[in-house]
């Protein structure tokens, strides 16, 4: 009973979601909460299930496009669930779901622990990175994840890396039937601190130089159709700078879409579909979005 009372004290209604996403777009959450503990997440999850509400999880709000119409049910923002514990004896790091990935990468580098240098520019949290199998600079979460703690309808469970069925920017967690609350990462301690810091700094500068950080965006919009690069195909179609409303294909990196001020989620989706159609017509390549669509859209063919 105490958990339910506590939830009712923190639960909010009709909360604008644009400020919680890196695109800075999106409508209202029917219900919204920011649980600060695993127990609070479990209570909120159970409440939503009993009410037959869908549950949506947010972290940094990157890699997401939330509809202008908002989201029904309960939105749980896990950004308050932070922290990381480094075990020098084993090289294992226990990380909470809301821990920002760049902060984690810098923390590892400062201790001379290798394995997260690639992640320094990832605009998200640990939970989102685990779900999406985030990656960059030749590394990804699947390389270092050992296990993950999730909340399901059955309660708190521990899943192995094999159970996640990792693939390129994919895991079974994307079905939304489980909520990541923490994960164990296997890193490599004992390196020269200066060496790891140098590699991390180099990766960060490379991302700052080649990717747009000056305007709201979600990170890479499309998966790379290996061995080709989505950005190169989009650029070859002459789409850099192409704009629908205030949504624009970045002139710095064509696999990024920018909110130039007052873009709507629908503008961004329309631009995504235009890019897909143009690349398909020119190269016969079907670009698959890396960004996840949440809510109802008026789709554009």
Swiss-Prot record:
Residue ranges of domain FAD-binding PCMH-type in the record: 24-190
Enzyme Commission code(s) on record: 1.3.1.98
UniProtKB keywords: Cell cycle, Cell division, Cell shape, Cell wall biogenesis/degradation, Cytoplasm, FAD, Flavoprotein, NADP, Oxidoreductase, Peptidoglycan synthesis
InterPro entries: FAD-bd_PCMH (IPR016166), FAD-bd_PCMH-like_sf (IPR036318), FAD-bd_PCMH_sub1 (IPR016167), FAD-bd_PCMH_sub2 (IPR016169), MurB (IPR003170), MurB_C (IPR011601), MurB_C_sf (IPR036635), Oxid_FAD_bind_N (IPR006094)
Catalytic residues identified in the record: 169, 220 (proton donor), 290
Catalytic activity: UDP-N-acetyl-alpha-D-muramate + NADP(+) = UDP-N-acetyl-3-O-(1-carboxyvinyl)-alpha-D-glucosamine + NADPH + H(+)
Domain of life per record: Bacteria
GO MF terms, alphabetically ordered: FAD binding; UDP-N-acetylmuramate dehydrogenase activity
GO BP field: cell division; cell wall organization; peptidoglycan biosynthetic process; regulation of cell shape
Record-level GO cellular component terms: cytosol
Cofactor(s) of this protein: FAD
Pathway(s) of this molecule: Cell wall biogenesis; peptidoglycan biosynthesis
Localisation per UniProt entry: Cytoplasm
HAMAP family, alphabetized: MurB
Protein task: Cell wall formation.
NCBIfam families listed in its UniProt record: murB, PRK13905.1
PANTHER family hit by this protein: UDP-N-ACETYLENOLPYRUVOYLGLUCOSAMINE REDUCTASE
Family designation: Belongs to the MurB family.
UniProt name for this protein: UDP-N-acetylenolpyruvoylglucosamine reductase
UniProt source species: Synechococcus elongatus (strain ATCC 33912 / PCC 7942 / FACHB-805) (Anacystis nidulans R2)
Upper classification of the organism: Bacteria, Bacillati, Cyanobacteriota, Cyanophyceae, Synechococcales
């Amino acid at each position: 009973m105490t958990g339910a009372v506590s939830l009712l004290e923190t639960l909010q209604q009709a909360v604008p979601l644009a400020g919680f996403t890196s695109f800075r777009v999106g409508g209202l959450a029917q219900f919204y909460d920011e649980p600060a503990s695993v127990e609070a997440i479990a209570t909120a999850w159970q409440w939503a299930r009993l009410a037959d509400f869908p549950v949506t999880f947010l972290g940094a709000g990157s890699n997401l496009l939330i509809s202008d119409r908002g989201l029904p049910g309960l939105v749980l923002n896990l950004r308050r669930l932070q922290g990381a514990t480094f075990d020098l004896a084993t090289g294992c790091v226990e990380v909470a779901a809301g821990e920002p990935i760049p902060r984690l990468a810098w923390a590892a580098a400062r201790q001379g622990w290798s394995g997260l240098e690639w992640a320094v520019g990832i605009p998200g949290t640990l939970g989102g990175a685990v779900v999406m199998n985030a990656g960059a600079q030749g590394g990804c979460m699947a390389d270092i994840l050992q296990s993950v703690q999730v909340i399901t309808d059955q309660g708190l469970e521990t899943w192995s890396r094999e159970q996640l069925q990792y693939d390129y920017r994919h895991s079974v967690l994307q079905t939304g039937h489980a909520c990541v609350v923490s994960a164990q990462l296997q890193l490599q301690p004992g390196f020269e601190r200066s060496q790891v810091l140098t590699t991390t700094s180099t990766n960060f500068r490379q991302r700052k130089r080649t990717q747009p950080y000056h305007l709201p965006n979600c990170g890479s919009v499309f998966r790379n159709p290996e061995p080709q690069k989505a950005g190169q195909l989009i650029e070859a179609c002459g789409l850099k700078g192409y704009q629908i409303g205030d949504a624009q294909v970045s002139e710095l990196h064509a696999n990024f879409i920018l909110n130039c001020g007052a873009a709507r989620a629908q503008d961004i989706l329309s631009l995504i579909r235009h890019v897909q159609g143009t690349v398909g017509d020119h190269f016969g390549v079907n670009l698959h979005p890396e960004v996840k669509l949440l809510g109802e859209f008026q789709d554009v063919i």
